Regions:
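Catalytic cores of large soluble enzymes that bind and process phosphate-bearing ligands
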Residues: 58, 70-75, 195, 199, ...
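Extended, helix-rich architectural segments
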Residues: 1-109
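Extended, regular secondary-structure scaffolds
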Residues: 87, 93-193
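Generic structural signal of hydrophobic/aromatic residues within well-ordered alpha-helices
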Residues: 6-9, 37-46, 66-70, 130, ...
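Extended, charged amphipathic alpha-helical segments
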Residues: 168-306
Length: 331
């Protein structure tokens, strides 16, 4: 997946929505309301998948040793982060490494800076994995990039002053890792490598715009201009202007039968805006397949059958996730 698309998804999760950059003419209300739907969808989907830690079944000393090693390595925490990454970006990336005591450990890498290259044939076997990141000097100033390339036998380290230079340089170091296979593993969210937020991102943006505009309209209504017609308003005997009289006395005296006053404001569209808000909210949950758990239909008196029906979409979504997560765990 393209890096700009992944960055857009990351921004949505971190509430850096496009609405925050919207500009309006000076003097006009310009509220920016960003809603955390992306974070909600990702966290609910990930927790539903691995909220209860993955269990490994087996008998014998080998199985017990494996479970102890996983516990010491905090694998359940890594699994949760990988599930969150997969729900957001469409894939999570795990690296297996040896710590200072030569014990195997694992960590989740940023999918924006790590990936696996596969064979271009029916086997689609992993050929190597890449993890790149900027490097800084002692003063903290960026001075180039470093890339670690993981093959089935060793870890190669490349450094260059520019990102493009990584493609042309020679490895600065080569260290065997002894895992016997590529120790970089991708956890796909589905066969399309698509996240749960992408399909509803435009709906979330529209929801942000709608709610921001509703607050803007409400503020403009409070500050609406008062139009007075058919009457001549003058300074009173205390030297107050018509505007000062209205502000202080809260009263308009219009003796002429043809005179009148009214506020200049948009026609009321509150009902239409609320209907649109509810439609957007419904579509966000419908197409992400993550239900609104604060919905009154999830009240405590709901029947088991009704609850199962409400969670049907999330159950189906989780089955797909589980299939691909299980396959990555076997690596």
């Amino acid at each position: 997946r393209r890096t700009p698309e992944l960055r857009r998804l990351r921004d949505a999760y971190q509430l850096r929505a496009p609405i925050l950059q919207r500009w309006r003419s000076e003097g006009l209300p310009n509220h920016h309301l960003a809603h955390g739907y992306a974070r909600y969808i990702v966290n609910i989907a990930a927790a539903y998948l691995v909220g209860a830690a993955v269990t490994y079944q087996g008998e014998g000393d080998g199985a017990d040793a494996l479970r102890r090693a996983y516990k010491n390595a905090n694998v359940s925490g890594v699994d949760m982060e990988l599930a969150r990454q997969a729900a957001l970006y469409g894939r999570g990336v795990e690296v297996i490494y040896s710590d200072a005591q030569a014990q195997p450990r694992s960590a989740a890498l940023d999918p924006l800076s790590a990936f696996v290259v596969y064979a271009d044939d029916v086997s689609a076997d992993p050929l190597f994995g890449v993890h790149f990141h900027p490097i800084t000097n002692e003063s903290g100033t960026p001075c180039g990039y470093e890339a670690e390339v993981y093959t089935a036998a060793e870890r190669l380290t490349y450094r260059a002053a520019s990102f493009s230079g990584l493609l042309l340089g020679q490895p600065k170091a080569s260290v065997p890792h002894y895992f016997g296979r590529v120790p970089l593993i991708e956890y796909w969210n589905n066969d399309e490598e698509a996240g749960d937020v992408g399909p509803v991102l435009s709906l979330i943006d529209a929801y942000d715009v709608l709610e921001s505009d509703r607050v803007n309209d409400q503020e403009q209504l409070v500050d609406a201009l008062l139009l007075v017609y058919g009457a001549r308003m003058e300074t009173d005997d205390r030297g107050r202007t018509p505007a000062q009289q209205l502000r202080q006395d809260k009263l308009l005296y219009l003796p002429d039968r043809e005179a009148g006053a009214q506020y200049l404001a948009k026609p009321g569209t509150g009902a239409d805006a609320e209907a649109l808000r509810l439609a957007l909210e419904k579509d966000i949950h419908k197409f992400s397949m993550v239900p609104d758990l604060s919905d009154e239909q999830f009240a405590g008196n709901i029947s088991g059958v009704a609850m199962r029906y409400k969670l049907l979409g999330l159950e189906q979504l989780t089955r797909v996730k589980e299939r691909w997560f299980r396959e990555a765990l076997r690596e």
